[in-house]
Amino acid sequence: MSRSAGSFLILNGKSADNEILRGSVKLLRDQGHPIEVRVTWEKGDAARYVSEAADQGAQTVIAAGGDGTINEVAAALAGVTQEKRPALGLLPLGTANDFATSAAVPDDIELALKLAIEGRAVPIDIAHVNDKTWFINMATGGFGTRITTETPERLKAALGGVSYLIHGLMRMDALKADRCEIRGENFHWQGDALVIGIGNGRQAGGGQELCPEALINDGLLHLRIFTGEELLPALFTTLTQPEESPNIIDGASPWFEITAPHEITFNLDGEPLSGQHFRIVVEPGALQCRLPPDCPLLK
């Protein structure tokens, strides 16, 4: 497979029976685009397929699935040497598709696949956590993380992103702030946080825009902390009038360190990571990604 033409499509196994996708792949193949398809079955498959694609000189690796699939593919690409690293394409097929949605990737499968193959590749940032794992979109901690990690799969499948909100309302009795300390470049905060969002991208949890100013090619991570001792009033004000909420703290830095006196959990593009200390560092321009020319996440 030549670097000038070939694409590997790594498809989440949950979407393997998608007939529209099958037809779109055939159409683009008929138009002269070589496309290899690989279907994931278990954790680690995507990384193996990325390695295979790089060894074969693929031009693009397309992550076909939700935010978790994009995360796994992007993390694997970050581990490929730069001279062999294919570009990343996005084909949103998940429940919420937060990263692809905020990047203005088309919902239409054929259009998204065409963009993933033919679109202009631009350098984008990715974030490294504790020198062992990655996220391309967002790390969220606190109550919001518990909701997204605990939301039942059937509810997500039936209602999409709205399911996170509904499940959250059902779990209001579990609202509990996390005490922590957060440091960054020219930033320091300590207190009780209901939700922490550290964004390379802008939205998480099924469409909640936690870091509205974030860009994926500015070399920065954007931080938003939702605070408040009276949690229900704070949450209501934050959701209805965010520009007026005294319970929002914002920051931006190439890195952030979070420490807590007890174990807290961060959700990294859907993957939970627990601990008492997190160091999150942006890797500027680490990946090439095929995005729309009007992508709002690019400066």
UniProtKB/Swiss-Prot annotation:
Lineage in the entry? Bacteria, Pseudomonadati, Pseudomonadota, Gammaproteobacteria, Enterobacterales
NCBIfam families according to UniProt: lip_kinase_YegS (TIGR03702), PRK13054.1 (NF009602), YegS/Rv2252/BmrU family lipid kinase (TIGR00147)
Question: Which GO biological-process labels does this protein carry?
Answer: phospholipid biosynthetic process
Give me the comment on cofactor binding: Binds 1 Mg(2+) ion per subunit. Ca(2+) may be able to substitute.
What's this chain's function? Probably phosphorylates lipids; the in vivo substrate is unknown.
Organism for this UniProt entry: Cronobacter sakazakii (strain ATCC BAA-894)
* A GO cellular-component term linked to this record: plasma membrane
Task: Report the protein name in the record.
Answer: Probable lipid kinase YegS-like
Keywords for the protein's UniProt record, in alphabetical order:
ATP-binding, Cytoplasm, Kinase, Lipid biosynthesis, Lipid metabolism, Magnesium, Metal-binding, Nucleotide-binding, Phospholipid biosynthesis, Phospholipid metabolism, Transferase
**Where's the active site on this chain?**
E271
